[in-house]
Amino acid sequence: MTDIPTLGVEEEFLLVHPGSGAPVALNREVAARAADMDVELQLELTSCQVETATAVVDDTAHLREQLLHLRRTASAAAEHAGARLLAVGLPPTLPHEFPVTDTPRYRDIGERYGMIAHEQGICGCHVHVAVPDRDAAIAVSNRLRPWLPLLLALTANSAIYRNADTGHASWRSVLWARWPSAGPPPHFDSADEYDAAVQMLSHTGVIRDDGMVYWDVRPSANFPTVEVRVADVPATVDETVLFAALVRGCVMTALEDERHGDPVLPLAPYALKAAYWKAARNGVDGDGVDLENHVPAPVSDLLGYLTERTRPALEAAGDHELVTAGLARVTDLGNGATRQRRAWRRNHDVDDVLAEAAAATLEDG
């Protein structure tokens, strides 16, 4: 295993009122200020969100530097516009509204999908890993399917929503699943079969365009990469780096397995759905589903198994120590959802959750 693929990361953030914590429609103002600071922010579907994107990097050290710089710049731009930047999967407090961003494409999506679009103030994280071609991206997608619930559990960061504990570590993933092309990707035998499926969804009007293929793994339409989209936006930079490193390890392992002709684990749809539900419900604080044996197992054990399964790739990329230390920290202290609940349970005061999320967003080590 000698080829170490490059990677890049996109993070979505929520803009909230610094006092009430309610989402605010200021993405254009924040993006304009960030542009003055030489950082390009993308506008998302709702006008209370912005997205950052790193450059293509070779290693996780440079990735971390970029992520921290982008979060700090976006936060400063938000503050200048009268908002606060939060790395949360969902707004912890009641939104005043989720107005759709005023572009032709987003207006059309708002009209087509109604409340699904207008309740879309949710934030995820997308990792792009370089692959040889689109057929390789599809092969990787097929092989990543059993690991997606674990990656969701690891990054869960949306336990508190509308001033209440949702009972789920990732309520974002539950809301996200309402889109017709969201969730785990189907198994495809080739890129041609994938393209035929996308064409069918588009031709029947189920999706507006190829950009609305929201499966949790997909070949990028714009880059020679496979894109893994299963995560809530992690609470901290270090958790994002951990997620990205583990995703790259999974992609490298999948490519190696494909080269060797190793069989793909067959997955019944009900089993994968069950594992997703457990991941969204429990995050890292409880059981997940062992999809090889169809039995419950502690998420910490399943993450340990995944680390060993991907160890050759992680070591080749120089990320094994980072991943093992990061997983130990998350297992011991919890992830974003754990932090949200810990803050909420102190006084059942959403201000505590907002303060915790704001601190985590810019946490450095």
From Swiss-Prot:
GO terms for biological process: modified amino acid biosynthetic process. GO terms for molecular function: ATP binding; glutamate-cysteine ligase activity. The keyword Ligase applies. Keywords: ATP-binding, Ligase, Nucleotide-binding. It comes from the Bacteria. Its EC number is 6.3.2.2. Pfam families: GCS2. Gene3D superfamilies: 3.30.590.20. It catalyses: L-cysteine + L-glutamate + ATP = gamma-L-glutamyl-L-cysteine + ADP + phosphate + H(+). Disulfide bonds: none annotated. Transmembrane segments: none annotated. The keyword Cell membrane does not apply. HAMAP family: Glu_cys_ligase_2. ATP-dependent carboxylate-amine ligase which exhibits weak glutamate--cysteine ligase activity. Belongs to the glutamate--cysteine ligase type 2 family. YbdK subfamily. PANTHER family: GLUTAMATE--CYSTEINE LIGASE 2-RELATED. This is Putative glutamate--cysteine ligase 2-2. The lineage of its organism: Bacteria, Bacillati, Actinomycetota, Actinomycetes, Mycobacteriales.
